[in-house]
Structure formats: C-alpha cells, structure tokens
Amino acid sequence: MKTRKLRDLEVSAIGMGCMGFTHAYGDAPEEKKGIELVHEAFDLGCNFFDTAEMYSYFKNEEFVGKAIKDLPRDRVIISDKFWPTPLPGMEMPEGKLSEAGIRRSLEGSLKRFGTDYIDLYTEHQMADGNEEEVAFIMGKLIKEGMIRAWGQSSPSVEQIKKAHAVTPITAIQSEFSMMERKWEKDVIPLCGELNIGFVAFAPMANGFLSGKISPSQTYASNDIRNVITRFNPDNMAANEPILELVEKYADEKHCTPGQISLAWVLKTAPYIVPIPGMRKSERIKENLGAADIELSDAEYRELTGALNKLKVYGNRDGKDIKKLGTVPDNVDR
C-alpha cells in the first residue's frame, strides 16, 4: 500500500472509516467478523483507522480497541475524535472543552482503545470561538505524549488559522467527494499552504458513487441514508449523469466506479487521505485497490471539468442527520 503524509504522520494512502461497524449504516457485522475485516485491511496495507467517541456513544471506540488489540501498536495509526459537548453519561460541570473536560474524554478513549496514546486526536464538529484555547490544550497533550498529533473536523478557514498559529494542526477531517466539493475553494488549498493533511470522509458520497445502490433500495431504520437527501429516489435519478460519467471512466481504466471516485479524491491533492467505510471483504479489496488506480493530469482535468457541468441534487446535512435520532442535538454540520 502506498503511503501519504498528514504533516509528519505517515499513513496508508487509503484509510478505513470504522463508524459503520457499530453506527449509522443499519445492522452491523457481528463483532468477531468486524474484527476479522479490520485485520484483513491491515494485512493489505491499511494502517489508518478512524473512529470517534460519539459513534454509538463509545461503542465504536471499544470495537476499534478490540480490533487492534492483536495488531502491532507501532504499525497502527488511530484517528479518534472528541465531541465538543458532554455525551450521555458524562458529567462535566467545567465544560467539555475545558482542559479537564478534554483530558477526561481522552482518558476514557485511551482506556477503550487499550493504549497509552492516540496518534491523531480531532475536535469533532468544531465549536465556535474557542479555537486557540483548544489548540493550546492539544499542545500540552502532545508534549505529554498522550497524543501524537491533533486535528479539526469541518472547520472554517479562520478557525484553522487561529488554531494552527497556537499548535500546528496535522489534519483537517471533512466530507469530500465528487458530490461534495465545497472544501476545494479554500480549506484544501489552505491545507497545502500550511502543510496540513486533509482526511476525506464519505469519499464515495456514502456509497452512491459505488454504483451499487438503486433508487428503489430500502434501508434499516437506523441507517443514515434514510435522511441524506441525495438518496431520495428522485435525487438519485437526477444524479444519474454523475454516475454515468464515473462509470465511463471506470470502463476506460478497467476498474470499478468506486475506485474511480477514490482515485479522483487522491488526485486532487497529495495530502488528501480518503477513509471509506468498508464492511465486506470484497469492498476492502476494491477500495484499497483504488490506491493503485492513477488518473493522469489530463484525465483528472477532463473528469473534473465534466463534473463541473453537472448539478448535484441532495446532500448530507447535519440538520437532516439529527432526524435519525442517533447523534447529539447539537449537530449542525
């Protein structure tokens, strides 16, 4: 597996988004099977595993801890995220983003992972107005060896600049795909200027760009795609030209639509690392194999130019996701 740099953190070119093993995508695989899938990804060269304390309220971290227990810790990169407000069961009168609150979150996560440090610790869904204070706390945790690096999730340019001036940021994590490109305008270029990596979640638009989902497909009641408007049957039909474009390039490159969508994300900038979810052995092989699919400069320009002419119908919005009832009320992105 090829590797990429998130600032000084070297990770596999494609990581594994672990959320779906316990959260947001309907019935999860049995724990034993899920652990086997994580091990399969690791054996194929994936060393970057992303989770968060908010996913299933700590259960996803517990799963990742069990999955990496028998893997060599020095070859595993744990990417974890802490929520900016107290989650159920947390008593934090001093505030979640105080130093005491962040330390309490971190200590809980370390215990669930069964480790004494986290490689990349990210503020999940950025709160407003406290960037410099959080950055200062992150700097202390790095010096103490509790975390190796820190990041922000879905921040503004101003939030990045303020925090980065206090403690250098290693990575920004935000949604990025052929169907969600708003970060191209300012955040991704800024990352390049400041030597900050960019971790792209939902790089295949929650599976739409895989070409394996039909407009008539139904989902379990706890599946996030029930509330993501791009999966509305009318929007799926309206977005068919995007999928046809991706399939055209997949045919030319002798690969799958999902691999083309990941290859496009990778080509956008050398410091972008996509973290698709993958809960089947064949998806792991397919998605990780996308690291070997290379678009030439001309192919990338042509594909991007064609995408620019197509309208995207529907999106993934925090206000819609709250309707699912599986995330805290303060989700706004």
Language model: regions and residue ranges:
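Active-site beta-loop-alpha junctions enriched in small/polar residues
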Residues: M19-F21, M54, K81-T85, E123-M126, ...
